């Protein structure tokens, strides 16, 4: 019987959960779910100077917001240092690693010699077969792996295929420093083995690491997990992703008003596809996702595509769910606090009532919040430039006879209001737009908004008439 699939996401808590890390987590999560397995979370916090609790919290928050749940408790790599030392000593005892007493001066000499000969700097193995009795007094050694010197190390990769590394290029790298702390290369292997990880899915910038880690697995006689090194994300211009392209933290995307489901949908398509399917549910992603379908080429990050997908998700969202998502993000978006303060019981009811019209015009929750501002605007309304031009003398003259028409409407519904204004337009020989445009400007202070009859209903009879009255004098 085959082992259950166990993947892992292993971020370093030296900053936020960036978008590349979020995609790596998503791929690990989807593959584990697809196979009925588990995704574990390991915090690689061995860099004590740069690792912070705040960054760890931001990573956990980012994963939770994205809906990527992990199995069991998050594991701290730093806390496992005694186990890393134990395995390093075991490798020495088994003749697979050795103590190296080379001084910093000797190592610099090796580097200088390599440079002079046009070779990449490599440790020359001088303590590989020396008797430990020759060790200089008072020098704390490092532990180096006895890497094979001939042949090649092959990384069997589900995405990249077989990748071959000549062993002469890999040298006897350090697995335990002289102060007893493990190197990243060693700690990762020990942790992945002890956690039972069967599949490693990570960025292809780790491909060279995979060769060195394979050497440690082989030295311990452990099974090497199935590797999948996924291509990095580039900007739309093909250059390496930077902050100007969108290499931001997941928290920034939340504050920009993206929905987690939409961001998941966008990220899964960065380097993986299922035919021509663009929009897919989480259930479909889980059913369809397989590492063998990941592309080798770098994916390109495209904000416009993300916005378009987010807009689709917003328009298909339940009004109450979208309302809840908006309220949750208000403290984080520009101008959101003022909107949040306006949401008393009446304000909440009005915003929910306006949601069908608002979501049709917004691609993000930030745009949705901006579109809702007219509901809570103070009288007399400040008019934007286009609204002011619509409410010139001609616009006000068109609007003046509309006031008594609206005042006379019995049932204040979109249907009744529509019928009354259309009848008035016909009687005056005007096109509906000729009335709707200055009416919208008077009601919202803007030239664009949800449908004008929906706006009248959301504002209510009293507020609507008062706003029109402000403009016609």
Curated annotation (Swiss-Prot):
GO terms for biological process: glutamyl-tRNA aminoacylation. It holds the Pfam family tRNA-synt_1c. It comes from Brucella canis (strain ATCC 23365 / NCTC 10854 / RM-666). InterPro entries: aa-tRNA-synth_I_cd-bd (IPR045462), aa-tRNA-synth_I_codon-bd_sub2 (IPR020751), aa-tRNA-synth_I_CS (IPR001412), aa_tRNA-synth_I_cd-bd_sf (IPR008925), Glu-tRNA-ligase_bac/mito (IPR004527), Glu/Gln-tRNA-synth (IPR000924), Glu/Gln-tRNA-synth_Ib_cat-dom (IPR020058), GluQ/Sye (IPR049940). One of its GO terms (cellular component) is cytosol. The keyword Nucleotide-binding applies. Its EC number is 6.1.1.17. It is found in: Cytoplasm. ATP binds at residue 243. A motif ('KMSKS' region) lies at residues 240-244. The keyword Disulfide bond does not apply. Monomer. Residues 113-136 are annotated as: Disordered. The gene is gltX2. A motif ('HIGH' region) lies at residues 11-21. Its main location: cytoplasm. Residues 113-133 have a biased composition (Basic and acidic residues). It catalyses: tRNA(Glu) + L-glutamate + ATP = L-glutamyl-tRNA(Glu) + AMP + diphosphate. This is Glutamate--tRNA ligase 2. Keywords: Aminoacyl-tRNA synthetase, ATP-binding, Cytoplasm, Ligase, Nucleotide-binding, Protein biosynthesis. Belongs to the class-I aminoacyl-tRNA synthetase family. Glutamate--tRNA ligase type 1 subfamily.
């Amino acid at each position: 019987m085959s082992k259950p699939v166990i993947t892992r996401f292993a971020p370093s808590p030296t900053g936020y959960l960036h978008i590349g890390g979020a995609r790596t987590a998503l791929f690990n999560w989807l593959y584990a779910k697809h196979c009925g397995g588990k995704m574990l979370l390991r915090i690689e916090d061995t860099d004590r100077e740069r690792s912070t609790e705040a960054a760890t919290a931001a990573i956990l928050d980012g994963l939770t917001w994205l809906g990527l749940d992990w199995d069991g408790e998050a594991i701290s790599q730093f806390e496992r240092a005694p186990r890393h030392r134990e395995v390093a000593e075991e490798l020495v005892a088994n003749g697979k690693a050795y103590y190296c007493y080379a001084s910093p001066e000797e190592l610099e000499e090796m580097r200088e010699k390599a440079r002079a000969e046009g070779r990449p700097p490599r440790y020359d193995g001088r303590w590989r077969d020396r008797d430990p009795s020759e060790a200089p007094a008072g020098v704390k050694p490092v532990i180096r792996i006895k890497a094979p010197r001939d042949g090649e190390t092959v990384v069997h990769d589900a995405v990249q295929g077989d990748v071959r590394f000549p062993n002469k290029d890999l040298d006897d790298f350090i697995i335990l420093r002289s102060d007893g702390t493990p190197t990243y290369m060693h700690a990762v292997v020990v942790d992945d083995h002890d956690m039972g990880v069967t599949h490693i899915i990570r960025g292809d910038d780790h491909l060279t690491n995979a060769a060195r880690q394979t050497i440690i697995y082989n030295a311990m006689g452990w099974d090497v997990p199935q590797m999948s090194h996924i291509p990095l994300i580039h900007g739309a211009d093909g250059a390496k992703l930077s902050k100007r392209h969108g290499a931001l933290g997941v928290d920034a995307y939340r504050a920009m008003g993206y929905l987690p489901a939409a961001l998941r949908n966008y990220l899964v398509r960065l380097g993986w596809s299922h035919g021509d399917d663009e929009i897919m549910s989480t259930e479909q992603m889980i059913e369809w996702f397989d590492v063998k379908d990941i592309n080798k080429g770098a994916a390109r990050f495209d904000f416009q595509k993300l916005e378009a997908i987010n807009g689709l998700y917003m328009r298909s969202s339940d009004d109450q769910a979208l309302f809840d998502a908006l309220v949750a993000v208000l403290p984080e978006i520009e101008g959101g606090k003022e909107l949040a303060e306006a949401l008393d019981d009446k304000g909440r009811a009005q915003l929910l009532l306006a949601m069908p019209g608002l979501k049709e015009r917004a691609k993000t929750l930030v745009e949705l919040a901006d579109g809702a501002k007219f509901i809570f605007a103070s009288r007399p309304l400040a008019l934007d430039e286009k609204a002011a031009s619509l409410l010139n003398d001609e616009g006000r003259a068109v609007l003046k006879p509309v006031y008594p028409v609206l005042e006379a409407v019995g049932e204040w519904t979109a249907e009744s209001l529509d019928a009354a204004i259309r009848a008035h337009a016909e009687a005056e020989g005007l096109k509906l737009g000729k009335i709707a445009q200055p009416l919208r400007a008077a009601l919202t202070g803007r030239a664009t908004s949800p449908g004008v009859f929906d706006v009248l209903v959301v504002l209510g009879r009293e507020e609507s008439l008062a706003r029109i009255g402000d403009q016609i004098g």
